[in-house]
């Protein structure tokens, strides 16, 4: 969206014009989701109702599931994390932490959404503040098993939520191995024990901020990994700054829908 700034008007200087630049992002449409099925001549001669039941409906469901999984896999591009890896959220404070992260990252207040895996959903739908109608104002969570809207976020469950496996097999006393200049998007790390490699979607915490690894790194050699690509850009970091590697975790997502775009177009007609 166009971003403008409000300023104090100075009659002696007059109007200060701002350009209304609407940023654009190039999107490469290079993925085609397909459901291929083989049918005999007798099967293709079946009535339309049978064709719907045997192919069209299950094919549509398979495509929807793939699109859902592909969308949830965008967690690999998100650096902002809360909670403890390997521990399902189970309290109102966990939900409050999610809201805080959205607030700090200036997500619009309306339309916020969270998608939880089955384990987190089971924990959160047991919260007394959600289940008890006299507290929540509704018995929907108890009757329908739906968390609903809590802390300004619409909550949903999906079996398609990904489980992220950290690429490192050992990481002890990890630190920045060379000073980093402000604005850099690469850094090198070492530790007393560092094996494996960092993979896309791994998260590093440095100086109270978190950064996501944007591409697989080289394998660790002599307890060090160089040229690790991360997002967002780094501040100036001193050599030996402490690094916390977030371990394997379930990649539940909380976001505003405008954070992502689903882009599609009709297939070209065959000649």
Predicted regions and their residues:
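A contiguous pocket-lining binding segment that forms or flanks enzyme active sites
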Residues: 96, 101-105, 239-243
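Beta-strand elements of well-folded, non-transmembrane domains
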Residues: 2-4, 41, 159
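Autoprocessing Asn-cyclization modules and mimics
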Residues: 89, 123-239
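Short linear interaction motifs
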Residues: 94-96, 185
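Long, contiguous amphipathic alpha-helices that act as assembly "spine/axial" helices in icosahedral shell
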Residues: 27-94, 103-120, 143-156, 200
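Assembly/oligomerization interface modules of large self-assembling protein complexes
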Residues: 1-32
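Glycine- and charge-enriched low-complexity intrinsically disordered segments
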Residues: 224-271
């Amino acid at each position: 969206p166009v971003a403008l700034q409000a300023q104090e008007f100075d009659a002696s200087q007059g109007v200060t014009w701002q350009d209304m630049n609407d940023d654009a992002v190039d999107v490469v449409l290079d993925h085609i989701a397909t459901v291929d099925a083989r049918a005999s001549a007798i099967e293709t001669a079946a009535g339309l109702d049978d064709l719907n039941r045997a192919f069209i409906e299950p094919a549509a469901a398979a495509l929807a599931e793939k699109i859902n999984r592909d969308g949830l896999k965008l967690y690999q591009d998100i650096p902002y994390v809360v909670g403890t890896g390997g521990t399902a959220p189970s309290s109102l404070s966990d939900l409050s932490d999610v809201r805080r992260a959205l607030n700090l990252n200036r997500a619009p207040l309306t339309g916020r959404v969270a998608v939880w895996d089955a384990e987190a959903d089971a924990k959160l739908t047991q919260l007394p503040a959600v289940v008890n109608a006299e507290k929540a104002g509704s018995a929907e969570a108890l009757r329908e098993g739906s968390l609903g809207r809590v802390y300004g976020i619409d909550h949903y469950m999906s079996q398609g939520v990904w489980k992220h496996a950290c690429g490192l097999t050992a990481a002890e006393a990890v630190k920045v191995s060379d000073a980093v200049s402000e604005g850099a998007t690469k850094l090198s790390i070492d530790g007393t024990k560092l094996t494996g490699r960092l993979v896309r979607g791994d998260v590093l915490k440095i100086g109270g901020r978190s950064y996501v690894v944007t591409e697989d790194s080289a394998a660790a050699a002599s307890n060090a990994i160089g040229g690790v690509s991360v997002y967002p850009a780094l501040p100036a970091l001193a050599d030996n700054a402490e690094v916390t590697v977030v371990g394997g975790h379930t990649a539940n997502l909380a976001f505003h829908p405008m954070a992502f775009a689903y882009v599609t177009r009709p297939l070209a007609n065959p000649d």
